Swiss-Prot record:
GTP binds at residues 20-27, 88-92, 142-145. Its main location: cytoplasm. Increases the formation of ribosomal termination complexes and stimulates activities of RF-1 and RF-2. It binds guanine nucleotides and has strong preference for UGA stop codons. It may interact directly with the ribosome. The stimulation of RF-1 and RF-2 is significantly reduced by GTP and GDP, but not by GMP. This is Peptide chain release factor 3. The gene is prfC. It holds the Pfam family GTP_EFTU.
Length: 529
């Protein structure tokens, strides 16, 4: 049976994100992936500060200065017969919920681990998020050109700490100065490493067969013997790769390599296009939408300001779930019940924009947004439904924000509300006074907000500490009890950027006591967009 042209396009798509701890090499891998997909001609190695060659995927002012990727960029490139969409997530102090929400827009993740360090804190957090949807995970053990931990230990650590089985696909031969290459367990081939070829794709010498004398000649008898001994252990002790278990999120295929040395990334990409799922179905509040449906649907998972410093614009990122986008199409924005004509959607190669003529499930579109689109918005061809599972998280850090120039209160509020719609930060306005409280998931978000208020809204703001430990969204089915709760707790209540009522607790003890005192009121840690 041959697939229709539409279904062929759907089957070609692979949409994934990279998750890692800061400095495990995510930006470098992103570049090398693009290099293998021929999307960039030479990879700009991630830079020392002040160098002119910025990595392709870091593009807001502050990112350029700090050498970190703050915002989620989207890059599409061809690989073999597939079209791959890579969503880049912020790496540092995991900037914000942006990262978590980006993971709701992908069908698969690549986990990058620094093989000298093993599983680190941020990786654990991000893995918990992927677990909510049983997202399939591929693993890349990076930095083999440095001295690394014992590979068996690394696999054990991933299995024990992240509760996912490991199925090694390739296995390293030596490491650091003695790194010679990797052996492919399923192809029975050894790929030999040459140093210093980071910017170009190198011709790799391949030795067929584990017992081939050429292998001993190429890597030395000691390392060849060590490889054979290790493989006996590995094959006895680790999982075999099984595609069904991979798709269920129960085992992860593991690849070894060095992104900086441009080695091993293509083995992982081969696995990604062979095994990762084509665009998956999604839940809405009324039914499940399949990618094979020809009517268009999509949801907004992120809003980003100023992708173009020359224009004060904001772009909403939409993941296409079903149907084909065509230029000039009329779509229903379900939340406000309005039909909008979308004629100038964008596709990205981080920061380079080009207008799209068409897009298919799995693709990410950029919609120009003048404040009318919010995170979580669903677009359809008329059907009234809403995609679920795009979360807002209660912030963990709070500061009061105030102006150096009190006359700019209006600009400050506008800036904060826009930044909160974008998911860069959350803003709370206490009911009983005129304070503005900013809530964030990571410390760096506070700096980002002040920098962006200054550069985009021309507002100079400073922070003060504030007596808030945590926040919860509150609601109740019992109107009478809710009124009483609101009356008695007025000093602890605030409205967030979307005017949702929030309880801001000075201490965790206070929160627990208040929850006990008002059993009819729900205190929520997350809120659906």
């Amino acid at each position: 049976m041959t697939l229709s042209p539409y279904l062929q396009e759907v089957a070609k798509r692979r949409t994934f994100a990279i998750i890692s701890h800061p400095d495990a090499g995510k930006t470098t891998i992103t570049e090398k992936v693009l290099l293998f997909g021929q999307a960039i001609q030479t990879a700009g190695t991630v830079k020392g500060r002040g160098s002119s060659q910025h990595a392709k995927s870091d593009w807001m002012e502050m990112e350029k200065q700090r050498g970190i990727s703050i915002t989620t960029s989207v890059m599409q490139f061809p690989y073999h017969d597939c079209l791959v969409n890579l969503l880049d997530t912020p790496g540092h102090e995991d900037f914000s919920e942006d990262t978590y929400r980006t993971l709701t827009a992908v069908d698969c993740c690549l986990m990058v681990i620094d093989a000298a360090k093993g599983v680190e804190d941020r990786t654990r957090k991000l893995m918990e998020v992927t677990r909510l949807r049983d997202t399939p995970i591929l693993t890349f053990m990076n930095k083999l050109d440095r001295d690394i931990r014992d590979p068996m230990e690394l696999l054990d650590e991933v299995e024990n700490e992240l509760k996912i089985g490991c199925a090694p696909i390739t296995w390293p031969i030596g490491c650091g100065k003695l790194f010679k290459g990797v052996y492919h367990l399923y192809k029975d081939e050894t790929y030999l490493y040459q140093t210093g070829k980071g910017h170009t794709i190198q011709e790799v010498r391949i030795v067929k067969g584990l017992n081939n004398p050429d292998l001993d000649a190429a890597v030395g008898e000691d390392l060849a013997q060590q490889l054979r001994d290790e493989l006996e252990l590995v094959q006895g002790a680790s999982n075999e790769f099984d595609e069904e278990l991979f798709l269920a999120g129960e085992i992860t295929p593991v690849f070894f390599g060095t992104a900086l040395g441009n080695f091993g990334v293509d083995h992982m990409l081969d696995g990604l296009v062979a095994w990762a799922p084509a665009p998956m179905p999604r839940q809405t509040d009324t039914r499940t939408v399949e990618a094979s449906e020809e009517k268009f649907t999509g949801f907004v998972f992120k809003i980003q300001a100023n992708m173009d410093p020359k224009h004060r614009d904001r772009v909403a990122f939409m993941r296409v779930v079903s149907g084909k986008y065509e230029k000039g199409m009329k779509l229903r924005q379900v939340r406000i019940g309005k039909d909008v004509v979308i004629s100038d959607a964008l596709t990205f190669m981080a920061g380079d924009r080009s207008h799209v003529e068409e897009a298919y499930p799995g693709d990410i579109l950029g919609l120009h947004n003048h404040g009318t689109i919010q995170i979580g918005d669903t677009f359809t061809q008329g059907e009234m439904m809403k995609f679920t599972g795009i979360p807002n998280f209660a912030p963990e850090l709070f500061r009061r924000i105030r102006l150096k120039d009190p006359l700019k209160q209006k600009q400050l509020l506008k800036g904060l509300v826009q930044l909160s719609e974008e998911g860069a930060v959350q803003v709370f306005r206490p009911i009983s006074n005129n304070d503005l409280i900013v809530g964030a998931v990571g410390v760096l978000q506070f700096d980002v907000v002040v920098a962006r208020l200054k550069s985009e809204y021309n507002v100079e703001a400073i922070y003060e500490s504030v007596n808030v430990a945590t926040a919860r969204w509150v609601e109740s089915a019992d109107a009478k009890k809710f009124e009483e709760f609101k009356r008695k707790n007025e000093t602890q209540l605030a409205l967030d950027g979307g005017d949702n009522l929030t309880y801001i607790a000075p201490t965790m003890v206070n929160l627990n006591l208040t929850q006990e005192r008002y059993p009819d009121v729900q205190f929520r840690k997350t809120r659906e967009h």
